[in-house]
Amino acid sequence: MSIGLLCCVAFSLLWAGPVNAGVTQTPKFHILKTGQSMTLQCAQDMNHGYLSWYRQDPGMGLRRIHYSVAAGITDKGEVPDGYNVSRSNTEDFPLRLESAAPSQTSVYFCASSY
């Protein structure tokens, strides 16, 4: 199999320590082959209503993927294609990548606010 056929999507995530973290993302780093799926976890312990997932591509600013204003309410951001989210409670806001593509190689951020 040639190296050209084996495309990988690399995910690099900011990660805060477990003590007084505020927002925690896991896993910290992840590499996927094209077509693989995975879930990025985002947990916050500040009882914030607003949670957002962003991606930052090389040389670009942040672009919002999906966001939520409260548990059970989610909406699409600027670049939602290829991603799904859910929010069943205030604390958790996982981002699901259904089928990795090289164009999704990026740094991913989860953020919370009031």
Swiss-Prot record:
PROSITE patterns: IG_LIKE (PS50835). GO terms for cellular component: plasma membrane; T cell receptor complex. One of its GO terms (biological process) is cell surface receptor signaling pathway. It is found in: Cell membrane. It comes from the Eukaryota. The keyword Glycoprotein applies. Residues 22-114 form the Ig-like domain. Alpha-beta TR is a heterodimer composed of an alpha and beta chain; disulfide-linked. The alpha-beta TR is associated with the transmembrane signaling CD3 coreceptor proteins to form the TR-CD3 (TcR or TCR). The assembly of alpha-beta TR heterodimers with CD3 occurs in the endoplasmic reticulum where a single alpha-beta TR heterodimer associates with one CD3D-CD3E heterodimer, one CD3G-CD3E heterodimer and one CD247 homodimer forming a stable octameric structure. CD3D-CD3E and CD3G-CD3E heterodimers preferentially associate with TR alpha and TR beta chains, respectively. V region of the variable domain of T cell receptor (TR) beta chain that participates in the antigen recognition. Alpha-beta T cell receptors are antigen specific receptors which are essential to the immune response and are present on the cell surface of T lymphocytes. Recognize peptide-major histocompatibility (MH) (pMH) complexes that are displayed by antigen presenting cells (APC), a prerequisite for efficient T cell adaptive immunity against pathogens. This is T cell receptor beta variable 6-9. It comes from Homo sapiens (Human). The gene is TRBV6-9.
